[in-house]
């Protein structure tokens, strides 16, 4: 994929990232080889300062594994995760620890991500106390209250416990914890999927406001295209561990190229009843194949209406530029 010039600083450059897991064989034979699950299989992606990269795809497509490999929660099998010119996959010890201040994460289940035995104040303060032990208690408490105010939490709840809060409030606590170290980038792993629709909008708008105020860059993972469209500057569409389409959000949503992206877009409801009735639904046949035994050639060919014999023989590569790129033998960006 060709890189186009931009005035913004390139923070994250993911190159041919692969995350494979060895799965024990269910065979009764003791000498059976373990299976190889390809959770992420050669992803390229870029994120510029102040932008949001939206990652979308069906459940099981590798979105969360991709995000966790960036931050180092799962080990990359191959490829590079270049952060400000340095490959995170090769960092260890003190050097890797220092980068953790710049890259934080918000998790999918807001309540499960919070320690039930710790107060809200202690949860938010924990990263600060870990990386800046020289701060006294009053300084820590002051910063915690300041961050609570930024995310819309009242200071008088600082001594309460997670179970006393709603899902949306718990996610605000998680956001405050991620922001307390003043990171450059936050990875949001489906942060609104466990919340009610009305609360989803509040959390997404809060993230957009904080991004504008603090100059944050976001990697935002979701399966809801309407959320991705609302928050993203760039979009990466994943299918079975592979990137099938990527580019600027306006290009992806105004003219989706890949058959999989088109099918996802056609499933999004349109508020206007006349347009909703008139639109063409592009159906996908069959289920998502197993990542342990993916189809040969193009991984999407078993569900693709455009598939031909060559699709079973040749695996397409992503072609295009930073504005719009697609991975299909029958479509060009």
Name each model feature, range by range.
Residues 5-7, 24-31, 248-333:
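Charged, flexible cofactor/metal-binding loops and thiol motifs
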Residues 30-33, 88-104, 130-133, 137, ...:
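ABC ATPase NBD coupling module
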Residues 79-87:
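Conserved ABC transporter NBD signature motif
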Residues 87, 138-156, 265-266:
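Conserved ABC ATPase "signature" region
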Residues 161-165, 169:
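Conserved ABC ATPase signature
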Residues 180-184:
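A short, proline-enriched helix->beta-strand linker immediately N-terminal to the Walker B motif
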Residues 191-195, 199-276:
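P-loop NTP-binding/switch modules centered on Walker-like glycine-rich loops
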């Amino acid at each position: 994929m060709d890189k186009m010039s931009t005035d913004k600083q390139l923070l994250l450059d993911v190159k041919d990232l692969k995350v494979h897991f060895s799965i024990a064989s269910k065979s009764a034979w003791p000498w059976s080889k373990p299976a190889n699950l390809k959770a992420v299989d050669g992803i390229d992606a870029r994120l510029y300062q102040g932008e949001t990269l939206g990652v979308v795809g069906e459940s099981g497509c590798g979105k969360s594994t991709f995000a966790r490999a960036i931050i180092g929660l799962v080990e990359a099998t191959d490829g590079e995760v270049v952060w400000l010119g340095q490959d995170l996959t090769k960092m260890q010890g003190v050097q890797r620890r220092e980068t953790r201040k710049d890259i934080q994460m918000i998790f999918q289940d807001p309540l499960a991500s919070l320690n039930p035995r710790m107060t809200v104040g202690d949860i938010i303060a924990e990263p600060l106390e870990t990386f800046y032990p020289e701060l006294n208690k009053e300084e820590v408490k002051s910063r915690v209250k300041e961050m609570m105010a930024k995310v819309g939490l009242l200071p008088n709840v600082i001594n309460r416990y997670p179970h006393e809060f709603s899902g949306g409030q718990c996610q605000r606590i998680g956001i405050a914890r991620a922001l307390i170290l003043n990171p450059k980038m936050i990875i949001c792993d489906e942060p609104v999927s466990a919340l009610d629709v009305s609360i989803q909008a509040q959390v997404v708008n809060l993230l957009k406001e904080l991004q504008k105020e603090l100059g944050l860059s976001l990697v935002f993972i979701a399966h809801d295209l309407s959320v991705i469209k609302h928050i993203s500057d760039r979009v990466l569409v994943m299918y079975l561990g592979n990137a099938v389409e990527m580019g600027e959000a306006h290009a992806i949503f105004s003219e989706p190229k890949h058959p999989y992206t088109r099918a996802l877009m056609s499933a999004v409801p349109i508020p206007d009843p006349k347009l909703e009735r008139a639109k063409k639904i592009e159906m996908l046949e069959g289920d998502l194949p197993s990542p342990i035994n993916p189809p040969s050639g193009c991984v999407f060919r078993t569900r693709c209406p455009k598939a031909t014999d060559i699709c079973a023989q040749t695996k397409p590569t992503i072609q295009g530029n930073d504005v719009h790129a697609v991975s299909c033998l029958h479509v060009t960006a």
